[in-house]
Every structure is written in C-alpha cells, then in structure tokens.
Curated annotation (Swiss-Prot):
PANTHER family: SOLUTE CARRIER FAMILY 35 (PTHR11132). Highly expressed in heart, kidney, small intestine, placenta, lung and peripheral blood leukocyte. Weakly expressed in skeletal muscle and spleen. Not expressed in brain, colon and thymus. Nucleotide sugar antiporter transporting UDP-N-acetylglucosamine (UDP-GlcNAc) and UDP-glucose (UDP-Glc) from the cytosol into the lumen of the Golgi in exchange of UMP. By supplying UDP-N-acetylglucosamine, a donor substrate to heparan sulfate synthases, probably takes part in the synthesis of these glycoconjugates. This is Nucleotide sugar transporter SLC35D2. Pfam families: TPT. InterPro entries: Sugar_P_trans_dom, TPT_transporter. Residues 1-27, 75-146, 189-201, 259-265, 316-337 are cytoplasmic.
Length: 337
C-alpha cells in the first residue's frame, strides 16, 4: 500500500495528524527523489554528449527506454510490482502520453548537447509557466497570486539571462523550448492518466516505453543517428561504456521519479522541483562545465530565476505542511469514502 493509501486508511479510524503524516512524508521524499535523479542525469548526459562527444542522443534515449522496459518487466515477473497485462484498450487509455514521452525524451537529449549547462537550466524553467497554464486548462486547478508572481519571477530571470547569452545557439534554443512544451504536457497528462484502478504508475511507465521504442528506433535509423552511434570510436573505452549504462539506468529512475512526484504532488510542483535542482546544476556548470561564457547580465538573470524557484518551493511546501481544520479534513475523507 502506498503512503497516500495508508493515510486514507488511517484517516477512517485514527487521528487527523496521523492521517496526514504519511502523505506529507511521501510528498517530500518523492520530490527529493525526483530532484536527485534529475540532477544526476543532466550531469551524466552532459558528460556523454559534450565531453565524450557522443553524436547520437536518440540512440541514448532508446537505451533509456530499453532499460525501463527490462527493469519493469523483470520486476513484474518476480511480483515486486504489478501493472495490468496488455489489452487493446491500453493505447486508447494512454494517448497522447506516448507521443509526448518520446518528444520529451528526444528534445531533452538534443538540447543538452547544444547548450551550456547554465543556459540549458535557465531555459528549462519555461516548463513551469507552461505547466501552470496546462493544469489550469486541463485539470481545472487554481493557484494563488503569490505562486503566480513566483512563476513570473522565474520567467523574468530566464529572459534576462537568455537575452545576454554570449554563446547563442538557435538550434539549441528551439530544442529546449520544444522540450519545455513536451515536459509540461507530459507532466499534466501523466497526472490525469495515473489512475491506480487503471494502469497505475508502473503501467504508465512500461507501456509508454513499449509503444515508443520501435518508432524511436525507426527515427534513429532514418536520421543517421543509429549509424553514428555504431561508428562512434569510444565503444572500447570502459569508462564511456559504464557512463552510457549509468545514463540508461538513470533514464529509468528519472521517468519513475517523475511519475512518483506527480502522483503525490501536482505537475506544477514537479516542474518547480526540477527548477530548484537547477540551482546546483547551473552553478556546477559555471565552475566546472567549461562551456559557460560569463556575463554580468546573464549571471543576474540566472540568480533571479533561482530566487523565484526557491520562493515557489517555500510557498508550496508551506501550504502542504499547514494543518487543515478537522472539520474540513473529515469532509474530504467522507467524500473519498
């Protein structure tokens, strides 16, 4: 039983504080898990695509999908996890998630290879307002003025930083903005589709990867991406192979942690956790990335972004940790029953 499920079960006969605690812990831990996985995979992918010069981001994405399929399938066979067997209704239940999933995967890997780490992390923050907009339209959510102002601070900082980017790369900018759109849509639709009575967390992950690995392989072959991967001259380098396998495993962990964070939190909170993770990634990129060209305006914009993201996190966590009136909580539990 999940932490959220335990909370509901305890709420029927226990005290309100006890009912809230597991859900609160699950929210915080799932957000921390997602932030850690997101942080690690950006560093590993950056090393593969930039330091080693690996020319095939689509092939790397295929490796991450294959790792996801194998890990989940073996876990199901060993009865560690459960998700429904395939039937003809599953593609209809999932749509449009597989398309958003592969678009998010390919655009993310492509943009990582074409931009410096600090600029990549700044431009990825446009995922946040897009997620806010889509949650309002698709899920009918409403947010306070303080949260909206925090989001606008993130956007303002991103504009300032991007406007003074001394290593402007149009192709990289296009890929990262596509990645923002796909990430926002993927997060919102994942939240919508993740019904435990239907596919559940693991079913969404497994069937997404299954449906899109063959089309992605076809794209890789048709664009020459696969040929470049097979001709790459580092396949005898043990360190490179270990980093490639690590990236594949982290790709699975990132997908799982994203779904888990969206399950316990809102899609917007998941997007902002990714932005907070960028605090570490951006400053590490400035210090050791080797591809950041310093500009005062760029640096100021970067810090405005980070401040807005941290303020959003503070507001969101404060609202989650604030105890609800007992009467209101009982009403919520009655409705769930």
């Amino acid at each position: 039983m999940t932490a959220g499920g335990q909370a509901e079960a305890e709420g029927a006969g226990g005290e309100p504080g006890a009912a809230r605690l597991p859900s609160r812990v699950a929210r915080l831990l799932s957000a921390l898990f997602y932030g850690t996985c997101s942080f690690l995979i950006v560093l590993v992918n950056k090393a593969l695509l930039t330091t080693y010069g690996f020319p095939s981001p689509i092939f790397l994405g295929i490796g991450q999908m294959a790792a996801t399929i194998m890990i989940l399938y073996v876990s199901k066979l060993n009865k560690i996890i459960h998700f429904p067997d395939f039937d003809k209704k599953i593609p209809v239940k999932l749509f449009p998630l597989p398309l958003l999933y592969v678009g998010n995967h390919i655009s993310g890997l492509s943009s990582t290879s074409k931009l410096s780490l600090p600029m990549f992390t700044v431009l990825r923050k446009f995922t946040i307002p897009l997620t806010l907009l889509l949650e309002t339209i698709i899920l009918g959510k409403q947010y306070s003025l303080n949260i909206i102002l925090s989001v606008f601070a993130i956007i303002l900082g991103a504009f300032i930083a991007a406007g003074s980017d001394l290593a402007f790369n149009l192709e990289g900018y296009i890929f990262v903005f596509l990645n923002d759109i796909f990430t926002a849509a993927n997060g919102v639709y994942t939240k919508q589709k993740m019904d435990p009575k239907e596919l559940g967390k693991y079913g969404v992950l497994f069937y997404n990867a299954c449906f899109m690995i063959i089309p992605t392989l076809i794209i890789s072959v048709s664009t020459g991406d696969l040929q470049q991967a097979t001709e790459f001259n580092q396949w005898k380098n043990v360190v490179f192979i270990l980093q490639f396998l690590l990236s594949c495993f982290l790709g699975f962990l990132l997908m799982y942690s994203t779904v888990l964070c969206s399950y316990y939190n809102s899609a917007l909170t998941t997007a902002v956790v990714g932005a907070i993770k960028n605090v570490s990634v951006a400053y590490i990129g400035i210090l050791i990335g080797g591809d950041y060209i310093f500009s005062l305006l760029n640096f100021v914009g970067l810090n405005i972004c980070m401040a807005g993201g941290l303020r959003y996190s503070f507001l969101t966590l404060s609202s989650q940790l604030k105890p609800k009136p007992v009467g209101e909580e009982n009403i919520c539990l009655d409705l769930k029953s």
